[in-house]
Amino acid sequence: ADFINAYLLGNLGTTGTSVAACATFLYNLRQGIKDIQSGESRIAIVGTSEAPLTPEVFEGFNVMGALAEDSKLRALDSLAPGASFDSRRACRPFGNNCGFTLAESSQFVILMDDALALELGANILGSVSDVFINADGYKKSIAGPGAGNYLTVAKAAAAARSIVGERALRERSIVQAHGTGTPQNRVSESAILNRVAKEFGIQGWRIAAVKAFVGHSLASSAGDQLMSTLGLWAHGTIPGIETVTELADDVKRDNLDFVLKHRESDVGTIDVALLNSKGFGGNNASATVLAPHITQKILAARHGQKAMTDYFHHNEAIAANSNDYDAAASRGDHRILYHFDDGVLGEEALAFGATTTGRCASVQVGENRPPINLDLKSPYAGLAD
């Protein structure tokens, strides 16, 4: 956040971060959502970057027995020592597996309140109704599973049901699982998803796991899951867990449908997705993500059809600019934003305002920013006079 605020955005607004192991992205997503829902902010840029591919990190996870080592993979596939193997199949969520593969990732999203998104004509890729967080309570081992993730998944499912209805949850939803590729995860997470599906009357709950392709980027991993979900709605394909040929025997599956092959899906047939993240130490988080067509339906109900007509008109230019930028970036022809020592604000940029009684009531930073109100209301006002 420091680098982005100081050298990319020149941001003077609220900033902050949460660190929650592998659930870090969702913890920060929740922080941005709460700031917008409370009216504290109208826009929030949320994201994480993780670059753990260093000898020290590899050694630490290897000591834990969490990584898919070459020797383990050869043993898993009944190969002789030194034999070559397909390293692209190293991470096998919910299959016969032996650990995860570390990855680098940087994922950022822009959240806006309803009115601002419509006013700007922003590309609406989906929406997040909430992120639910629960710890595990007392634990036998800090790395062991607990009850917390059952609670977060159940809450996320309940939130989806309250918005899109019981039938849509049962027939038109999907789960982006944490799916690390470890034996412990395949047992614990499948049990959680299977139990919640049973309690909510869901049969054949579709389960995807993007780590099969990109590995485990730790703090950014839920960002990978979110991007995969948004891509599902943009391109109409559910990514299959194609590193797995068959599920492991200890995977719970009575109420689940693990998507092992790419599955073409009409973008309008999945209304909601649940993202699940299980962070080391009991940092459990699950998010409810609504499809673009559901988001637009909600916006039309709240703001009226005229507002939506105006939005689609504004969006034409935005969508064209977005496509042009994407094409340029894909060609390697992108413009780097880096404002080092550019537009630095000091005391001379501050202008304080006062009421007619001389009470300091506002401060403005620079000429192009609106004044900041200093006449703050507090529930404790006057109690200490």
What is the predicted function of each stretch?
Residues 1-31, 64-67, 71-101, 192-224:
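Conserved catalytic cysteine-centered active-site region
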Residues 1-14, 344-385:
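A glycine- and small-residue-enriched flexible loop/hinge segment at structural boundaries
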Residues 1-15, 35, 49-60, 162-187, ...:
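Conserved beta-ketoacyl condensing-enzyme motif
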Residues 5, 15-50, 100-122, 216-241, ...:
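Active-site-proximal alpha-helical scaffold in enzymes
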Residues 15-20, 41-49, 123-132, 166-177, ...:
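Beta-strand segments within the central parallel beta-sheet cores of soluble alpha/beta enzyme folds
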Residues 25, 32, 61, 110, ...:
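Conserved small-residue
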Residues 72-174, 291-358:
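Condensing-enzyme catalytic core mediating Claisen C-C bond formation in acyl metabolism
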